[in-house]
C-alpha cells in the first residue's frame, strides 16, 4: 500500500549558511507598502500606519511516499521529454506529465517487496531514473525482469502559495496555503482582509529569494481604453451583424490540445449569448493535441485533420485559432509570415472572419525565461510576429499572452495555472483566453 507522509521541512534537511543581508524588493501595493527579505525564511512588510511587520515563512514540506507498487518497470523509452522516459512516480505526477524538480532523487529506493524489502535493487545495474522528472525504468541484464512487480520509496516537495494579508484591525498576518504538486491555490480571505502579496514556494528550495515574492500590484488586467470604434465593429463586422440580427452564426475554434479541452471557447460563447440574447450561435471545435498549424497544412486529403476539409470545409463565419505549439517551432520570421498569409487568404476566400489568439505562457525555460515575475513582455518570436501580422492585415487579435505576462502583478505565478505543470491551463487559465476574446467586443452594442 502506498503511503504519503509529511516529514521534516527542507530548512532542516538542507544545510545552508545563515543569511544576514536584507534585500529590498521594489514594488508597492494598494496600501503603499514595501516587502523585504530579511532572512532565509523571513520577510518584513513596511507600510501603512502600523508596523513594520516581520513574518516567518514555513519552509517547503517533504512528502514521503512509501511502498508505491509498480506492476512492472518499463524499459527505457527514448524521448526528449523526461516525463515519458519511464514509469511516472505517483507523487510528482500531474495530468499526463510529471513536475520537474519536485522529486528528491536521493530518496529513491526500489525493492522487491514492501516494507524493508527482501532485495534492494541497484541504480545503474538494475534500474535508472531521470532525476529531474521523476521517471524510472529497468535496465536490460539487471535483476528486475520485464514482468516483475517492484515497490518504491521516494520523496518529493509540492508547491505552496502563502499570502501576506492586511486584516480589518490594521495588522499584517501570514496565511499559509495548501500544498499541491502543480496548482497550489492562494489562501482564502475573510471579509475585511486585503491580500498584499503572495509568497510562492515552487518546490525544493533551501531559502527564499526575490523571485519567490509576488506583491499584489494590480487587482485585474488593466484594459486599455479603445480609441475610435470598438474592435469587433471594425474588424469583425459580419460576425457582429449576425450576433445582432439573430442570423445563424457558426464559430470554429481551431487549435491544439489546449483548444481540445473545449473550455475557453465555451465560456466565450456563453458570454456572447448573454450579451446578444437573440443570437443563434453554433460552436465547433477542431483540435489536434501535440500538433501545430504546420501539421494541419501538411495533412493529405481524407485525413482526420486535413485543413481544407476539416477547417475550411466546416464553412465557419468566424475562426478562432490557438496554437501554443507553434511558438515552439524553430522558424524564421519569414516562415511564420508566409504561413499566416496563406491562412488569411484561405479564410478571406470563403468569407470567414478570423481571431488570432496569442498563446499563454508555458514552462519558463521553454520560453527562455528564468523566473515567473517581471515578465510583462513575451520573448517568443512567434508572439511578436502574430502581433505585427494582425496589425498590418487588420485581423482581430485576442492577446492572451499579454494577460499572462502580467499575472505576476496580480500576485499569481503563471505556471501554477497549468494542470500539467508545463502548458495545459486549468479553468482559470482558460478564462484568461475567454477574457481576451471578450475584450474585442467591449463597447459593441447588442443592437
Outline where the language-model segments fall.
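Secondary-structure transition/turn motif
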Residues: 59-61, 138-146, 177-180
Amino acid at each position: 500500500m502506498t503511503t504519503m507522509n509529511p516529514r521534516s521541512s527542507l530548512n532542516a534537511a538542507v544545510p545552508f549558511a545563515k543569511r544576514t543581508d536584507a534585500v529590498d524588493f521594489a514594488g508597492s501595493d494598494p496600501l503603499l507598502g514595501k516587502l523585504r527579505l530579511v532572512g532565509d525564511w523571513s520577510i518584513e512588510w513596511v507600510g501603512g500606519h502600523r508596523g513594520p511587520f516581520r513574518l516567518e515563512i514555513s519552509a517547503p514540506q517533504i512528502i514521503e511516499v512509501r511502498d508505491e507498487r509498480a506492476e512492472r518497470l518499463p524499459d527505457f523509452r527514448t524521448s526528449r521529454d523526461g516525463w515519458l522516459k519511464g514509469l511516472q512516480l505517483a507523487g510528482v505526477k500531474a495530468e499526463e506529465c510529471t513536475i520537474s524538480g519536485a522529486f528528491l532523487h536521493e530518496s529513491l529506493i526500489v525493492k522487491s517487496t514492501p516494507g524493508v524489502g527482501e532485495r534492494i535493487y541497484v541504480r545503474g545495474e538494475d534500474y535508472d531514473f531521470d532525476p529531474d522528472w521523476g521517471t524510472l525504468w529497468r535496465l536490460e541484464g539487471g535483476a528486475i525482469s520485464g514482468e516483475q512487480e517492484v515497490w518504491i520509496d521516494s520523496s518529493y516537495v509540492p508547491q505552496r502559495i502563502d499570502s501576506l494579508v492586511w486584516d480589518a484591525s490594521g495588522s499584517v498576518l501570514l496565511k499559509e496555503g495548501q500544498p499541491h504538486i502543480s496548482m497550489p491555490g492562494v489562501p482564502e480571505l475573510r471579509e475585511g482582509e486585503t491580500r498584499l502579496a503572495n509568497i510562492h514556494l515552487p518546490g525544493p528550495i533551501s531559502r527564499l529569494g526575490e523571485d519567490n515574492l509576488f506583491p499584489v500590484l494590480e487587482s485585474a488586467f488593466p484594459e486599455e481604453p479603445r480609441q475610435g470604434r470598438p474592435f469587433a465593429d471594425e474588424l469583425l463586422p459580419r460576425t457582429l451583424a449576425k450576433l445582432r440580427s439573430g442570423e445563424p452564426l457558426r464559430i470554429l475554434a481551431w487549435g491544439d490540445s489546449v483548444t481540445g479541452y473545449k473550455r475557453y471557447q465555451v465560456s466565450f460563447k456563453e458570454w456572447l449569448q448573454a450579451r446578444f440574447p437573440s443570437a443563434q450561435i453554433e460552436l465547433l471545435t477542431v483540435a489536434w493535441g501535440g500538433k501545430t498549424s504546420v501539421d494541419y497544412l501538411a495533412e493529405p486529403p481524407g485525413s482526420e485533420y486535413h485543413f481544407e476539409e476539416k477547417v475550411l470545409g466546416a464553412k465557419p463565419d468566424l475562426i478562432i485559432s490557438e496554437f501554443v505549439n507553434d511558438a515552439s517551432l524553430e522558424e524564421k520570421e519569414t516562415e511564420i509570415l508566409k504561413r499566416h498569409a496563406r491562412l488569411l487568404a484561405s479564410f478571406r476566400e470563403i468569407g470567414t472572419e478570423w481571431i488570432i489568439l496569442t498563446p499563454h505562457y508555458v514552462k519558463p525555460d521553454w520560453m527562455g525565461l528564468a523566473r515567473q515575475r517581471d515578465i510583462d513582455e513575451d520573448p517568443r518570436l512567434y508572439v511578436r510576429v502574430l502581433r505585427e501580422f494582425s496589425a498590418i492585415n487588420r485581423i482581430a487579435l485576442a492577446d492572451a499572452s499579454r494577460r499572462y505576462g502580467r499575472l505576476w502583478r496580480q500576485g499569481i505565478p503563471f505556471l501554477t495555472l497549468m494542470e500539467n505543470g508545463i502548458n495545459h491551463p486549468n479553468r482559470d487559465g482558460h478564462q484568461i483566453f475567454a477574457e481576451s476574446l471578450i475584450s474585442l467586443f467591449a463597447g459593441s452594442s447588442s443592437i
